[in-house]
């Protein structure tokens, strides 16, 4: 009894001391503890082995700053936790992207983190909250999430993010872009397939899938893309399974070879990834640059996707629009091998596109064939 009373008095004294100092008792750290990892097969990044909701239930929230302890004593410190890739190109973040099965440790348009950090299937990482809400202003500025319900969009075409790419000297009815006509995770595949058939698409650059993942889609009960499958069976769909690191030499080599394959096939050509947004956006920017389009034309094409998915325009969300538009500036600087502060208006986009394809391994004759396929 005396021992219990002494413990109570000690606890009361401790609380009194904290109250007298105007301080609270130390908070329990918000952390995952050591947690397993999974390889993100699409992009080669590190998934945490829990769902986004389960991660948030631990006390994390979008806009927080976190520290990530990795194997071998490596760490990513003070990085943002966002619901999208709202960091500069090449910067690290923890991302709980809507529709992803797990939070992912990634570099925005950067090297795959699984290989970068030498991860193995039995590896563990630890994520710890560093500062609550440190990046909340950026999270609030972007804070984009779209619906997968057709009824929430004005038309089937907007829902499918399907459109003809236009600008510069690009020939009419030559190049199209869309959400995936085969991967139905967002419920858009059948719509994109229907528009591809109506446009008379004869060749497809599938930037996101491998042969194996595609076969998996065709076995699903909801697969309803007969036209796309007929193109695939005829050898007219190129499965590229590319990540999003468009600055990498391997990306340039794979893409350049694919564009030459496009040039020697019958068009029109459809370019797509999953959403038809990021990888597709870069590829279309490159093809428009090769077709003598202006930076404004390339930007306008890219931003249609954000109007389609999120309703983001210059008029509806000007600050968000401008922040997203900066992605195109980085595309064009990459294509032209320009520095991060180079004025986009000073870049020769066509010559930059030619040099990019040379870096990717194409000869001048092959590059001319790609340009001839595209332009009037």
Segments from the language model and where they lie:
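Long, compositionally biased stretches
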Residues: 25-107, 113-128
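Bacterial N-terminal signal peptides
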Residues: 8-16
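Active-site cradle of extracellular carbohydrate-active enzymes
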Residues: 270-274
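Sec-dependent signal peptide cleavage junction
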Residues: 15-26
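Ser/Thr-glycine-rich phosphate-binding loops at phosphate-binding pockets of nucleotides
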Residues: 275, 279-280
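Positively charged n-region of N-terminal signal peptides that target proteins for export
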Residues: 1-8
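Cys-dependent protein tyrosine phosphatase-like superfamily
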Residues: 23-24, 102, 109-111, 115-269, ...
């Amino acid at each position: 009894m005396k021992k219990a009373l002494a413990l109570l008095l000690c606890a009361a004294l401790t609380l009194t001391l904290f109250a007298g100092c105007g301080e609270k008792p130390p908070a329990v750290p918000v952390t995952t503890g050591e947690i397993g990892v999974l390889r993100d097969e699409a992009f080669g990044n590190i998934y945490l082995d829990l769902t986004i909701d389960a991660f948030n239930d631990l006390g994390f929230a979008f806009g927080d700053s976190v520290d990530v302890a990795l194997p071998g004593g490596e760490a990513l410190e003070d990085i943002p936790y966002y619901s999208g890739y709202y960091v500069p190109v090449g910067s690290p973040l923890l991302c709980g992207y809507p529709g992803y099965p797990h939070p992912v440790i990634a570099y925005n348009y950067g090297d795959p983190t699984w290989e970068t950090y030498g991860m193995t299937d039995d590896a563990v990482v630890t994520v710890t909250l560093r500062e609550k809400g440190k990046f909340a202003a950026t999270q609030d500025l972007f804070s984009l999430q779209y619906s997968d319900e057709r009824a929430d969009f004005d038309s089937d075409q907007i829902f499918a993010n399907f459109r003809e790419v236009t600008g510069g000297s690009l020939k009419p009815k030559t190049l199209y872009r869309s959400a995936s006509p085969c991967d139905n995770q967002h419920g858009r595949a059948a719509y994109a397939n229907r528009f591809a058939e109506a446009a008379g698409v004869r060749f497809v650059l599938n930037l996101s899938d491998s042969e194996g993942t595609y076969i998996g889609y065709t076995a699903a009960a909801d697969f309803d893309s007969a036209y796309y499958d007929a193109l695939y069976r005829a050898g007219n769909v190129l499965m590229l399974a590319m990540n999003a690191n468009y600055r990498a030499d391997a990306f340039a080599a794979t893409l350049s070879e694919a564009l030459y394959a496009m040039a020697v096939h019958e068009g029109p050509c459809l370019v797509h990834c999953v959403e038809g947004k990021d990888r597709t956006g870069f590829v279309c920017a490159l093809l428009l640059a090769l077709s003598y389009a202006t930076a404004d034309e390339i930007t306008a094409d890219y931003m249609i996707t954000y109007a389609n998915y999120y309703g983001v325009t210059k008029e509806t969300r000007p600050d968000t629009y401008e922040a997203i538009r900066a992605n195109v500036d980085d595309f064009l600087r990459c294509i032209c091998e320009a520095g991060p502060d180079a004025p986009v208006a000073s870049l020769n986009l066509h010559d930059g596109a030619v040099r990019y394809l040379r870096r990717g391994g194409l000869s001048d004759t092959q590059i001319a064939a790609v340009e001839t396929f595209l332009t009037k």
